Every structure is written in structure tokens, then in C-alpha cells.
Amino acid sequence: MQVGSKKASMGKQQQSVSDATSPRPPLAPSEKNNVGSVTRRARTMEVSSRYRSPTPTKTRRCPSPIVTRTAPSSSPESFLKRAVSAERNRGPSTPTTPVSDVLVDLPVSSRRLSTGRLPESLWPSTMRSLSVSFQSDSVSVPVSKKEKPLVTSSTDRTLRPSSSNIAHKQQSETTSVTRKQTPERKRSPLKGKNVSPGQSENSKPMDGSHSMLIPPQHRWSGRIRGNRSFDLGDKAVRRVSLPLSNKSSRHKKSSSDITRLFSCYDNGRLEVSSSTTSEDSSSTESLKHFSTSSLPRLHPMSAPGSRTASPSRSSFSSSSSSNSRGMSPSRGVSPMRGLSPVGNRSLVRSSTPPSRGVSPSRIRQTAQSSSTNTSVLSFIADVKKGKKATYIEDVHQLRLLYNRYSQWRFANARAEGVSYVQSLIAKETLYNVWHAISDLRDLVTTQRICLQQLKLEIKLRSILNDQMVCLEDWAMVEREHISSLAGAIGDLEANTLRLPLAGGTKADLGSLKLAMSSALDVMQSMGSSIWSLHSQMEEMNKLVSDLAVIAKTENFLLDKCENLLASTAVMEIEERSLKTHLIQKKQEEEVRDDAESSPLLPLSKFQWP
């Protein structure tokens, strides 16, 4: 009953996992590369349920990345399980040294160099480094092509399970009646690396260094006939026993070898590079930036020479590590084994198999030990860790967006400051221009006012010049007018003030009338006589005015004569001097003539005083 219930529960889990995962393409093209002699097993397998196991399960907790732990021990039977090759058979080879012992004895750095990642790899849900999101300084990790396992014996690109896997299949068939241990969580196997079967995918790196995640090689179990279960231990044994050069020396590297990989340290940024020694690796190396403080928690990534994983089982780490998961030139990739795109976090969550059962085509039987028992709590913890990783990734994205927002704010503030300064300069320039224009307007206004005043003055002067003749005539008319007014005033005074009007005087009106009339007659007679004399006086006045003009002309002529007399005196003196000079010249000529006429008797010359 228990076996039947286990089968039913396992069938439900397989159906739920197959429904949850992405649909695969048919595996028909891979049939031509495999040998048909190997009989196919049924697609359903008896896999013990991890939830209904009567044995007490032990919760597997993720080890701390700081505390170094040894790999869990496993039974030697797990190292006999190897993939069976479709073309050739290999003899069952047992490792001379248990893999778990090798992992314990080897240094952490040598294990990392030989396997490409630590023995305990992160679960896909926790592969994403949580501390990388908060570090501004990143580390460039070019993945080396040295770590790619070489296949020199054949160019076939099919999966070749080893004979140890056949032996393991026979052993599993003989022991199918007994109840199997609760299988461990499925994880991405390490390609050709020493991995203990007891190591779960949820475990973290043992030391503080980074690790490399190698995608699984035998994800597509449909390409292998007769065996649908794979073990990680037998692949590790097979990779250890490969007769390739420089393979055994990888496991003997000390921890000092990795110090040569850290080449430059500049401002908190490390660049770790590995030398490429594979002669048939032609794919380009990809860079992975990570923080030095988050090396213990760095999510692994696959080497360029490793095989690609299936889309439903690939471990997606980040968009930057997708380039490092290329294909080896010597190992082609079938259309059904192509590399799926990387960069969607939903694929990371969907690739983790938490508490959803195990597909029959993906089951890997591990060693039957008590250390492989897992519980539901570990799956819940994995889910929580995956959510935490996504939350921290969202926080990292938010911080990046906030940094970009801060940069744009700074750029906008700087642009606003520049525009504000430019506006101030423009305003100041406009104010200066306005002030200069206002000054020019004031100057033009004052000049216009002055010009208007000058025009008014010129007009006033022209009017006054026209009135000057009338004003000059007015002076003469005013003088005559004043004289006539003075005569009229004298007559009125003589007629009024000389009469005895005060002291009670009395006069006879008849006699007064007669006296007044007689006085008037006398005055009229006097006026007629004065009028006759007045004409004579006017003539005399005219003669006197002519005489004044003549006298003035005479005075002018007298002044002129005086000047002429003064000049005549000077001219007279000059005339006398000239005459004297002429006389002297004449005398000199005469003496010279006399000397020429009588040369024997020279005459003495006497100078005139």
C-alpha cells in the first residue's frame, strides 16, 4: 500500500511539475545520435516521495557563507554511477580517492579553480547575489576557457553515459523492491566536477570567494536510452578519471594560485581573469561585475566552454552573465538544447523546484544517506530566500532609478541655475539698455526744448526788429505830446487858480463876462502873432540844425587835417635824411672819379663824420 501511495503521489508531483514548467519540444531528433541497442525504460519510475517518507526527515539549512563547512560524506556507491555512452562501453572505474575526501582535503581555492565553482552551490532561487545590488564598485570576472572539459576522442555531440551509470542502473533495478531514500532536491549538476552526492543545491559557498555555476549536461534525458536517472557523483568521478593532460594538476592548485588572478585593484574594483588554454574554444569571454564585499554571496555563472542547459532547468543568474553561457565549438547544440534567453526574474523563480514534485525525466538518484533527507521547511525557506532576492533586486533597481532620478534632478537644477543666471544677465542687460535709452530720450527732449527756445527767440527778434522804427518815432512823438500836455495844464492853472475864489469875494457877472471876453480877445490876438513867429522859428530851427551838421563835418575834417599834419612832419624828416644821403653818394662818386683820373698821386679819403 505504501508503495502504491508513493507511486500515486509521485505521479501527481510529476504531473504538477510538468504542467508548471515550460513545454519542451519533442526529442525525436536526438534519436538518430543514439544507439538503438539500449532498451528504453518506462517513462514512469518508482521514486520515493520526500513528503510521505515514514523516516524522520532532517531540515537542510543553507550553510553560512562565512563559516567554512566540509562537504557531507557519501557512500562509495554514488561514485559508481556514471552516464552510459551510446557508442562505446567503458569499464566500471572506481576513483582511487573518494571524491568527498578530495573535496575536504583540497583547499577552497583549488576546488574553485578545478571545478569552476564551490562544492556547495547556491540554489537557483538564491543564486542572485544579494549584496551585489548595493555595491557601487563591481568586479569584472572574465570566465576562463581553461575550465572547459575537452573531448578529444570523438566529435559526436551526443550524451554518452558511462559504464558506471549502467552498473548503477542494474543495482537500482535489483534494489527496486526496497524502499528508497527520500531523494534530494534536483539541482544543476556541475560539469565534470567533484561534487559530493550529499550536497544540496540550496547550500551556499563554503568560503568567501565567488563560485561558478556550470549548467547541467544531461538535462535532456530522452537522448539517453535505457537510463533516465543521473547522478552528480558519477560525473564527478568520470571527470576526475579523464585521461586528459593538465586535469590532475587542477586539483593540486594551492590557494596561492588564485592570488595571481586578482590583477588590479583600483578604487574598490577588482578584475579577475583566467588564462585560456583550451585549443578548441573560440567563443568570446564575458565579463561579470560583482562587489568585493559580496564575494561569498556571488551567484555563479557557467564557463563559455560548458554545455548549455535546457530552458526549464537552466540556472538564470543575471542578464550580464548570459553571454558567458556560450557553446563550445567542439560540442554542438541541438535545436532542443539551445541556450534559453536570460534576464527574466520569473524564469529564475520558475526554474527552482520548491515543493512541486520531481519530473521523471529529471530525477537524479543520490546516495542513500541520512544527510540527503530534506524537509518541506527547506523548500519554504528557499522560496522565501528567492522572494527576498527578488525584493532586494527590486530595491537595487529602485536605488538605481533613484540615482538616475537624482542625476536628472542635479542636471535639471544645474540647467535651472544656468538659465536663472542667464535670465539675470539678460534682465541686467535689458535694464542697462532701458536706462541708456531713457538717458538718450532725456537728452533728445532737452535738445528739442533748447531748439524750440532758439526758434522762439529768433521769431521774437524778427518781430522786434520790425517795431524798432516805430519805437524810435514814438520817442519823438512822445516828446511833442508831453510839451502840449504841459501847455494845456498851464492854461488850466492860469484860468482857475488866479481867480479870487476864497475870502467871500463877490463879482458882478456882467463886468466879469466883459473882462473874460476882453482877455479872450487879447489871447487870440497874441496867438495869431505867435503863430506868425512860430513859422519863422521853425525856419530858424532848420537853419540851426543845418549849422550843427556842418559844424560836425568841420570837426571831422579838422581831425583829419591834424592827422595829415602829423604825417607830413614825419615825411619831412625822412625827406631830409634822404637828401643828405644823396649828397654823400654824390661826393663819393666825385672822389672816385678824381682818383681814376690821377693814379700817381692818390688822394687820401676822409670819412665824413
Curated annotation (Swiss-Prot):
Q: Where is the composition biased (Low complexity)?
A: 98-110, 129-143, 271-285, 302-332
A Pfam family of the record is: QWRF
Return the motif ranges for QWRF motif: 407-410
Q: For the region Disordered, what residue ranges are annotated?
A: 1-227, 271-369, 588-609
Q: Where is the composition biased (Polar residues)?
A: 11-21, 46-57, 151-180
Per the record, the coiled-coil ranges are: none
InterPro entries the record matches: QWRF (IPR007573)
Q: Which PANTHER family match?
A: AUGMIN FAMILY MEMBER, QWRF MOTIF-CONTAINING PROTEIN 4
Report the family membership.
Belongs to the QWRF family.
The name under which this protein is listed is QWRF motif-containing protein 4
Q: Which organism is it from?
A: Arabidopsis thaliana (Mouse-ear cress)
